[in-house]
Amino acid sequence: MDKQAIATWYDESSPLYRYFWYLNSDSFALHYGLWDIKTKHIGDALQNTNKVMAEQANITSNDRVLDAGCGIGGSSLWLAKYKKADVVGISISAKQIEKAKTLAKQAKVDHLVSFSVIDYLHTGFPNDSFDVVWAIESVCHADKKEDFLKEAYRVLKKGGRIIIADGFIRREPETEREKQLVTAFYKGMLLPNLYTFDQFEDAMKKTGFKHVTVFDKTHEVLPSVKRFYLICRFMYPLIVIAAVLHIVPYIFTAGCKAGSVQYEAVQAGVGGYGIMYGEKE
Protein backbone atom coordinates (compact mmCIF):
# COMPACT_ATOMS: atom_id res chain seq x y z
CA MET A 1 0.00 0.00 0.00
CA ASP A 2 1.54 3.28 -1.16
CA LYS A 3 0.28 5.45 1.68
CA GLN A 4 1.61 8.68 0.25
CA ALA A 5 -0.01 8.08 -3.14
CA ILE A 6 -3.33 7.22 -1.52
CA ALA A 7 -3.25 10.28 0.72
CA THR A 8 -2.36 12.49 -2.24
CA TRP A 9 -5.18 11.02 -4.32
CA TYR A 10 -7.80 11.83 -1.70
CA ASP A 11 -6.28 15.24 -1.00
CA GLU A 12 -6.27 16.24 -4.66
CA SER A 13 -9.65 14.73 -5.54
CA SER A 14 -11.51 16.26 -2.59
CA PRO A 15 -13.00 19.12 -4.67
CA LEU A 16 -14.28 16.62 -7.24
CA TYR A 17 -16.08 14.60 -4.56
CA ARG A 18 -17.59 17.80 -3.19
CA TYR A 19 -18.84 19.09 -6.53
CA PHE A 20 -19.83 15.84 -8.21
CA TRP A 21 -20.60 13.34 -5.45
CA TYR A 22 -21.98 14.32 -2.07
CA LEU A 23 -22.97 17.74 -3.45
CA ASN A 24 -25.02 19.78 -0.97
CA SER A 25 -25.79 16.86 1.33
CA ASP A 26 -24.35 16.75 4.83
CA SER A 27 -23.10 13.18 4.35
CA PHE A 28 -19.54 14.31 3.49
CA ALA A 29 -19.14 10.78 2.16
CA LEU A 30 -16.64 9.49 -0.38
CA HIS A 31 -18.28 6.09 -0.97
CA TYR A 32 -20.89 4.56 -3.28
CA GLY A 33 -24.02 4.62 -1.13
CA LEU A 34 -26.90 2.15 -0.86
CA TRP A 35 -30.16 2.68 -2.75
CA ASP A 36 -33.59 1.27 -1.95
CA ILE A 37 -37.07 2.01 -3.32
CA LYS A 38 -37.38 5.11 -1.13
CA THR A 39 -34.03 6.63 -2.11
CA LYS A 40 -34.45 9.84 -4.10
CA HIS A 41 -30.90 11.09 -4.59
CA ILE A 42 -27.25 10.33 -3.92
CA GLY A 43 -27.26 12.13 -0.56
CA ASP A 44 -29.89 9.73 0.75
CA ALA A 45 -27.96 6.74 -0.58
CA LEU A 46 -24.81 7.86 1.20
CA GLN A 47 -26.66 8.22 4.50
CA ASN A 48 -28.33 4.85 3.97
CA THR A 49 -24.94 3.16 4.23
CA ASN A 50 -24.50 4.60 7.71
CA LYS A 51 -28.00 3.52 8.73
CA VAL A 52 -27.64 -0.04 7.44
CA MET A 53 -24.21 -0.56 9.00
CA ALA A 54 -25.14 1.01 12.33
CA GLU A 55 -28.22 -1.18 12.55
CA GLN A 56 -26.31 -4.35 11.70
CA ALA A 57 -23.60 -3.54 14.26
CA ASN A 58 -26.23 -2.43 16.79
CA ILE A 59 -24.33 0.76 17.63
CA THR A 60 -25.56 2.71 20.65
CA SER A 61 -24.48 5.61 22.83
CA ASN A 62 -22.56 3.13 24.99
CA ASP A 63 -20.17 2.24 22.18
CA ARG A 64 -16.70 3.53 21.38
CA VAL A 65 -16.22 3.26 17.63
CA LEU A 66 -13.05 3.30 15.54
CA ASP A 67 -13.79 4.71 12.08
CA ALA A 68 -10.84 3.23 10.18
CA GLY A 69 -10.18 5.27 7.07
CA CYS A 70 -12.63 8.00 8.05
CA GLY A 71 -12.15 10.36 5.10
CA ILE A 72 -13.37 13.83 6.05
CA GLY A 73 -15.43 12.34 8.86
CA GLY A 74 -18.83 11.76 7.27
CA SER A 75 -19.68 8.52 9.07
CA SER A 76 -18.03 9.61 12.32
CA LEU A 77 -20.20 12.73 12.43
CA TRP A 78 -23.31 10.70 11.64
CA LEU A 79 -22.60 8.16 14.39
CA ALA A 80 -22.03 10.95 16.90
CA LYS A 81 -25.10 12.91 15.85
CA TYR A 82 -27.63 10.10 15.48
CA LYS A 83 -26.25 7.34 17.73
CA LYS A 84 -24.48 9.53 20.31
CA ALA A 85 -21.53 7.15 20.04
CA ASP A 86 -17.99 8.06 21.06
CA VAL A 87 -16.08 7.95 17.77
CA VAL A 88 -12.39 8.02 16.89
CA GLY A 89 -11.75 8.67 13.20
CA ILE A 90 -8.38 7.92 11.64
CA SER A 91 -6.92 8.56 8.18
CA ILE A 92 -3.48 8.73 6.60
CA SER A 93 -4.40 12.08 5.03
CA ALA A 94 -3.58 15.12 7.18
CA LYS A 95 -5.83 17.29 5.00
CA GLN A 96 -8.77 14.96 5.54
CA ILE A 97 -8.25 14.99 9.29
CA GLU A 98 -8.03 18.78 9.35
CA LYS A 99 -11.30 19.03 7.41
CA ALA A 100 -12.98 16.42 9.64
CA LYS A 101 -12.11 18.40 12.76
CA THR A 102 -13.61 21.55 11.23
CA LEU A 103 -16.81 19.74 10.26
CA ALA A 104 -17.12 18.25 13.76
CA LYS A 105 -17.01 21.72 15.30
CA GLN A 106 -19.56 23.02 12.81
CA ALA A 107 -21.87 20.09 13.59
CA LYS A 108 -21.36 20.64 17.33
CA VAL A 109 -20.34 17.02 17.91
CA ASP A 110 -16.65 17.64 18.59
CA HIS A 111 -17.23 16.55 22.20
CA LEU A 112 -18.09 13.06 20.89
CA VAL A 113 -15.60 12.65 18.04
CA SER A 114 -11.84 12.95 17.66
CA PHE A 115 -9.71 12.65 14.55
CA SER A 116 -6.05 11.71 14.11
CA VAL A 117 -3.57 10.98 11.33
CA ILE A 118 -3.02 7.27 11.93
CA ASP A 119 -2.41 4.23 9.71
CA TYR A 120 -5.18 1.69 10.32
CA LEU A 121 -2.64 -1.13 10.02
CA HIS A 122 -0.58 0.23 12.90
CA THR A 123 -2.92 2.24 15.11
CA GLY A 124 -0.91 2.21 18.33
CA PHE A 125 -4.11 1.93 20.37
CA PRO A 126 -4.03 -0.39 23.40
CA ASN A 127 -5.58 -3.84 23.15
CA ASP A 128 -9.32 -3.99 23.78
CA SER A 129 -9.91 -0.27 23.14
CA PHE A 130 -13.08 -0.25 21.03
CA ASP A 131 -16.56 -1.75 20.95
CA VAL A 132 -16.84 -1.39 17.17
CA VAL A 133 -14.40 -1.15 14.27
CA TRP A 134 -16.09 0.51 11.29
CA ALA A 135 -14.63 0.80 7.78
CA ILE A 136 -16.21 2.05 4.57
CA GLU A 137 -14.27 1.56 1.34
CA SER A 138 -10.91 1.82 3.05
CA VAL A 139 -9.83 -1.78 3.60
CA CYS A 140 -9.65 -2.16 -0.19
CA HIS A 141 -6.39 -0.18 -0.14
CA ALA A 142 -4.60 -2.70 2.11
CA ASP A 143 -2.22 -5.09 0.34
CA LYS A 144 -3.19 -7.91 2.69
CA LYS A 145 -6.67 -7.50 4.09
CA GLU A 146 -5.63 -9.90 6.85
CA ASP A 147 -3.27 -7.26 8.24
CA PHE A 148 -6.19 -4.89 8.75
CA LEU A 149 -8.35 -7.62 10.26
CA LYS A 150 -5.62 -8.60 12.75
CA GLU A 151 -5.22 -5.00 13.93
CA ALA A 152 -8.99 -4.58 14.17
CA TYR A 153 -9.27 -7.77 16.20
CA ARG A 154 -6.51 -6.61 18.53
CA VAL A 155 -8.09 -3.24 19.36
CA LEU A 156 -11.60 -4.64 19.75
CA LYS A 157 -12.91 -5.46 23.19
CA LYS A 158 -14.29 -8.90 23.93
CA GLY A 159 -17.78 -8.91 22.48
CA GLY A 160 -16.79 -6.16 20.04
CA ARG A 161 -18.07 -5.99 16.47
CA ILE A 162 -16.51 -5.26 13.11
CA ILE A 163 -18.52 -3.86 10.20
CA ILE A 164 -17.03 -3.25 6.76
CA ALA A 165 -18.55 -1.97 3.52
CA ASP A 166 -16.34 -2.27 0.46
CA GLY A 167 -15.80 -3.40 -3.09
CA PHE A 168 -15.21 -7.07 -3.82
CA ILE A 169 -14.70 -9.41 -6.75
CA ARG A 170 -17.78 -11.58 -7.23
CA ARG A 171 -15.78 -13.97 -9.39
CA GLU A 172 -12.31 -14.00 -10.89
CA PRO A 173 -12.07 -12.35 -14.34
CA GLU A 174 -12.01 -14.93 -17.12
CA THR A 175 -11.83 -13.16 -20.47
CA GLU A 176 -9.10 -10.79 -21.59
CA ARG A 177 -11.60 -7.91 -21.50
CA GLU A 178 -12.61 -8.71 -17.93
CA LYS A 179 -8.96 -8.77 -16.89
CA GLN A 180 -8.45 -5.37 -18.53
CA LEU A 181 -11.43 -3.95 -16.65
CA VAL A 182 -10.15 -5.14 -13.29
CA THR A 183 -6.60 -3.94 -13.99
CA ALA A 184 -7.82 -0.48 -15.01
CA PHE A 185 -10.02 -0.21 -11.92
CA TYR A 186 -7.20 -1.25 -9.59
CA LYS A 187 -4.80 1.22 -11.19
CA GLY A 188 -7.19 4.17 -11.11
CA MET A 189 -8.39 3.63 -7.55
CA LEU A 190 -4.93 2.69 -6.20
CA LEU A 191 -5.99 -0.80 -5.18
CA PRO A 192 -3.45 -3.61 -4.84
CA ASN A 193 -6.23 -6.20 -5.14
CA LEU A 194 -9.77 -7.04 -4.10
CA TYR A 195 -10.91 -10.23 -2.42
CA THR A 196 -13.92 -12.31 -3.32
CA PHE A 197 -16.68 -12.50 -0.72
CA ASP A 198 -15.56 -16.02 0.17
CA GLN A 199 -11.90 -15.02 0.50
CA PHE A 200 -12.73 -12.14 2.81
CA GLU A 201 -15.12 -14.23 4.89
CA ASP A 202 -12.44 -16.89 5.25
CA ALA A 203 -9.86 -14.25 6.27
CA MET A 204 -12.20 -12.94 8.96
CA LYS A 205 -12.78 -16.40 10.37
CA LYS A 206 -9.06 -17.24 10.37
CA THR A 207 -8.38 -13.99 12.23
CA GLY A 208 -10.73 -15.18 14.95
CA PHE A 209 -14.00 -13.41 14.21
CA LYS A 210 -17.17 -15.33 14.95
CA HIS A 211 -20.70 -15.02 13.59
CA VAL A 212 -19.26 -13.74 10.32
CA THR A 213 -22.01 -12.61 7.97
CA VAL A 214 -21.75 -11.54 4.33
CA PHE A 215 -24.29 -9.20 2.76
CA ASP A 216 -24.06 -8.87 -1.03
CA LYS A 217 -25.09 -5.26 -1.70
CA THR A 218 -24.08 -5.11 -5.37
CA HIS A 219 -27.62 -4.46 -6.59
CA GLU A 220 -28.09 -1.67 -4.04
CA VAL A 221 -25.07 0.31 -5.28
CA LEU A 222 -25.93 0.00 -8.99
CA PRO A 223 -27.39 3.53 -9.32
CA SER A 224 -24.19 4.94 -7.82
CA VAL A 225 -22.05 2.73 -10.06
CA LYS A 226 -23.88 4.09 -13.09
CA ARG A 227 -23.65 7.66 -11.79
CA PHE A 228 -19.89 7.31 -11.31
CA TYR A 229 -19.63 5.92 -14.84
CA LEU A 230 -21.58 8.79 -16.43
CA ILE A 231 -19.59 11.45 -14.56
CA CYS A 232 -16.28 9.91 -15.61
CA ARG A 233 -17.32 9.40 -19.24
CA PHE A 234 -18.25 13.08 -19.39
CA MET A 235 -15.18 14.30 -17.52
CA TYR A 236 -12.51 12.07 -19.06
CA PRO A 237 -11.66 14.21 -22.14
CA LEU A 238 -11.54 17.34 -19.98
CA ILE A 239 -9.36 15.64 -17.37
CA VAL A 240 -6.91 14.45 -20.02
CA ILE A 241 -6.54 17.98 -21.39
CA ALA A 242 -6.20 19.43 -17.88
CA ALA A 243 -3.55 16.84 -17.01
CA VAL A 244 -1.54 17.61 -20.16
CA LEU A 245 -1.65 21.29 -19.22
CA HIS A 246 -0.58 20.40 -15.66
CA ILE A 247 -3.79 21.86 -14.23
CA VAL A 248 -4.64 18.62 -12.42
CA PRO A 249 -2.45 15.64 -11.44
CA TYR A 250 -2.08 13.04 -14.19
CA ILE A 251 -3.37 10.39 -11.77
CA PHE A 252 -6.84 11.87 -12.31
CA THR A 253 -6.90 10.35 -15.80
CA ALA A 254 -6.49 6.86 -14.33
CA GLY A 255 -9.17 7.67 -11.75
CA CYS A 256 -11.60 8.68 -14.48
CA LYS A 257 -10.73 5.53 -16.40
CA ALA A 258 -11.53 3.48 -13.31
CA GLY A 259 -14.93 5.15 -13.06
CA SER A 260 -15.59 4.35 -16.70
CA VAL A 261 -14.75 0.64 -16.45
CA GLN A 262 -16.31 -0.21 -13.07
CA TYR A 263 -19.83 -0.13 -14.51
CA GLU A 264 -18.94 -2.69 -17.18
CA ALA A 265 -17.16 -4.85 -14.59
CA VAL A 266 -20.24 -4.92 -12.37
CA GLN A 267 -22.53 -5.60 -15.33
CA ALA A 268 -20.28 -8.50 -16.34
CA GLY A 269 -20.68 -10.04 -12.89
CA VAL A 270 -17.04 -9.53 -11.92
CA GLY A 271 -17.27 -6.42 -9.75
CA GLY A 272 -19.31 -6.47 -6.57
CA TYR A 273 -20.04 -4.66 -3.34
CA GLY A 274 -20.81 -5.98 0.09
CA ILE A 275 -20.99 -5.52 3.83
CA MET A 276 -19.06 -7.83 6.15
CA TYR A 277 -19.90 -8.29 9.82
CA GLY A 278 -18.19 -10.24 12.57
CA GLU A 279 -17.78 -10.42 16.35
CA LYS A 280 -14.89 -10.95 18.75
CA GLU A 281 -15.88 -13.42 21.43
Give the positions of each predicted feature.
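N-terminal auxiliary segments of SAM/dcSAM-dependent transferases
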Residues: 1-21
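Conserved alpha-helix/loop element of class I SAM-dependent methyltransferases that forms part
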Residues: 23, 27-36, 40-61
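Class I SAM-dependent methyltransferase SAM/SAH-binding core
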Residues: 64-122
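A short acidic, Gly/Pro-enriched loop at the edge of an enzyme's catalytic core
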Residues: 121-132
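A short glycine-rich, Lys/Arg-flanked "PGG" loop and its adjoining helix->strand segment in the class I
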Residues: 146-161
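Short, glycine-/aromatic-enriched active-site segment of Class I SAM-dependent methyltransferases
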Residues: 168-192, 204
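Short alpha-helix
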Residues: 192-208
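Conserved Class I S-adenosyl-L-methionine
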Residues: 213-281
